[in-house]
Regions:
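A short, hydrophobic, proline-anchored segment that marks a local hinge/packing element in signaling
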Residues: 205-207, 344, 353-362
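Membrane-interface helix-start motif
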Residues: 6-7, 372-381
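Sensory beta-strand/linker motifs that couple input domains to effectors
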Residues: 366-370
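Extreme N-terminal signal-anchor transmembrane helix of membrane signaling/transducer proteins, especially
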Residues: 1-26
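Juxtamembrane membrane-water interface segments immediately C-terminal to a transmembrane helix
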Residues: 26-48, 71
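A short beta-strand signature within small-molecule sensing/ligand-binding domains used
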Residues: 110, 187-189, 337-339, 347-357
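Soluble sensory domains of the PAS superfamily and closely related sensory modules
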Residues: 320-339
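Structural preference for beta-rich elements and adjacent junctions enriched in aromatics
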Residues: 51, 58-322
């Protein structure tokens, strides 16, 4: 073979190298994505299978599993990192207003609520819009006769009403507003009543054990008419005889169970069958450093670049009323395990979320969501 032919063959070979390199990189990218998706999906499926054997962990009260969703009436109380100081001010609350209720006729009074649980205690931050606050006057009657708040729980299939009333702003404790339930002390419900520019605020703490996993509340506005013309705002009312709406909060048994499955760099979440967050566990990532990651820099840059070209969805944060949104969650609650990529807040990083349905009694009773970012997976490869 003469020199000219040899040069032609070498030139052709060199021309194929970029194409071969691109093919190699593409196959590597596909393998990385498939590997991460399979690993995260397997984790979600394993947790879902474990929880399927313990439906009581998701639903301590099985009756809630059989009832329809009530996003307007039910109260959602997420887990709090620390208990708030009961002083009637909202600066101790990280969450925004989770829901509000108002009088149908005049829109006043209006009741806004925040709720959270910590250490077996339910905390409430209630803000009432009232054009004219009327305080209880002990000289008129021992029974509350001014503006007040009613709490309604449900124990042993019977309701228990409590009233919060005061002659002046300051510390408050509940009183019975209906026949007393045996073994329940109204004084366990305590808090602080504070005047506000719009009306008043009441910050309360009460044991979860006395709620029966249901809670109704409504503000009573007497508006200067102590014997007539009352207006109310809340998720229940004085004439309601049925059980109050559900109080939805993370069951401690479920939180403990979920923490056992958390792997470094993964966030685990469990929702009920309506998509409301019931438990969450996050294990700190290991093996990651921003400046001196051991992962081969070219592989890291490649994975970021290829994901950036294909991932366009932003991850929605949990709503104040507890609902989680996402393509994979919708599919899991419909009975199908799915993975989906999202953009991350961190530059160049992306988030993989895999969801699997939790099945029980022949139906989907919830979903398990496992999240892991792309950088954490690369550190493990």
């Amino acid at each position: 073979m003469n020199l000219r032919r040899q040069l032609v063959l070498v030139s052709l070979l060199l021309l194929t190298l970029p194409w071969a390199g691109c093919q190699f990189l593409r196959e590597m990218e596909i393998a990385l994505r498939q590997g991460q998706a399979q690993a995260v999906a397997a984790a979600a499926t394993a947790v879902a299978a474990s929880l399927a054997e313990r439906p009581d962990a998701l639903y301590p009260n099985r009756e809630r599993l059989r009832t329809a969703d009530d996003p307007e009436g039910s109260l959602y109380a997420p887990m709090l990192d620390s208990p708030p100081l009961l002083d009637g001010y909202e600066d101790g609350w990280d969450t925004s207003i989770q829901g509000h209720y108002s009088s149908l006729e005049t829109r006043v009074p209006r009741l806004d609520y925040r709720a959270g649980v910590h250490g077996g205690t339910l905390y409430l931050m209630l803000q009432v819009t009232d054009e004219s606050v009327t305080y209880h006057d002990p000289g008129l009657s021992p029974e509350p006769n001014g503006d007040r708040l009613i709490l309604r729980t449900w124990l042993d299939n019977r309701r228990q009403d409590y009233v919060i009333a005061t002659p002046a702003p300051g510390s408050v404790r509940a009183q019975y507003a209906s026949p007393r339930h045996p073994g329940v002390d109204a004084g366990q419900i305590r808090g602080f009543w504070q005047d506000t520019r719009e009306g008043y605020a009441i910050e309360l703490a009460l044991p979860l054990s006395i709620t029966g996993q249901r809670l109704g509340l409504y503000a009573v506005d007497v508006d200067g008419h102590r014997s007539s013309g009352w207006r109310t705002a809340g998720n229940t009312g004085p004439l309601d005889l049925t059980a109050p709406p559900w109080l939805i909060y993370p069951p401690q048994a479920l939180q403990t169970e979920l923490a056992r499955f958390a792997q470094p760099g993964q966030r685990l979440r469990v929702t009920d069958r309506h998509g409301r967050l019931l438990a969450e566990a996050l294990a700190p990532a290991t093996g990651l450093a921003d400046d001196d990651d051991d992962t081969f820099w070219l592989l890291q840059a490649l994975y970021r670049r290829l994901l950036a070209e294909e991932v366009t969805d932003d991850r929605a944060a949990p709503q104040g009323n507890g609902y989680l949104q996402g393509t994979e969650i919708t599919a899991a609650l419909a009975g199908t395990a799915v993975e989906h990529w999202y953009r991350s807040d961190s530059a160049g990083r992306h988030l993989l979320a895999a969801a699997a349905p939790v099945r029980g009694a022949g139906q989907v009773i919830g979903a398990v969501v496992v999240e892991q970012n792309s950088e954490q997976y690369l550190s493990l490869t």
